[in-house]
Amino acid sequence: NKKIHEKDCFNLNPATNVMNPRAEAFLSCGIGSRPSLGYPGDKYEMGLEAIEEIEVLASSLVAEIFCSKFAEIRVPSGAMANLFSFMAVCKSGDTIIGPPASIGGHVTHHNPGCAGLFGLNIIEAPIDKDYYTVDIDQLRELALKERPKLITLGGSLNLFQHPVSAVSSI
């Protein structure tokens, strides 16, 4: 896992953690510093096969210990922060606009993530394929039509700067 993420590729995922050197040495294999969004067999990032095996084994063992059918062993982090942000600004049934997965939109801003689980009406932002971001003119039109409670630019992959000032002015 460490070889894949630190030697074989240039990791562009902003969610990758930088750990305390002692914690990194303790974990030696680097598993604790990798985001692992999604369920085993259906991850959003690549190269997580070892983590998936550990998640399945750990979940099975915890479920067995507590005599349950299922156990969630993954530590909540950024997803919980996103949920709390949605809860602070919106209520169930409100509409939000966010970037689609095709330009790196974060899973927590979509139906399978906390936005959908919180009951938000999620509309994908129009995109500018040339710059891998939202199309400001089309977004402005969509926002005027839909009147969203929130427009977010949250993403898992940010290759270029997002037009934060332009979105803020909408």
Which positions does each model-derived feature cover?
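N-terminal "arm"/small-domain region of PLP-dependent enzymes with the aminotransferase-like
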Residues: N1-D42
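Catalytic PLP-binding core of fold-type I/II PLP enzymes
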Residues: Q161-I170
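Gly/Ser/Thr-rich loops at beta-strand to alpha-helix junctions
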Residues: V18, P76-M80, I103, S156-F160
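Conserved PLP-anchoring active-site segment centered on the Schiff-base-forming lysine
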Residues: C90-H106
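PLP-dependent aminotransferase-class I/II
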Residues: T108-L153, N158-H162
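Conserved N-terminal alpha-helix of the aminotransferase class I/II PLP-enzyme fold
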Residues: P35-M80
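Short catalytic-loop micro-motif centered on adjacent basic/acidic residues
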Residues: N11, F70-I73, L150-G154
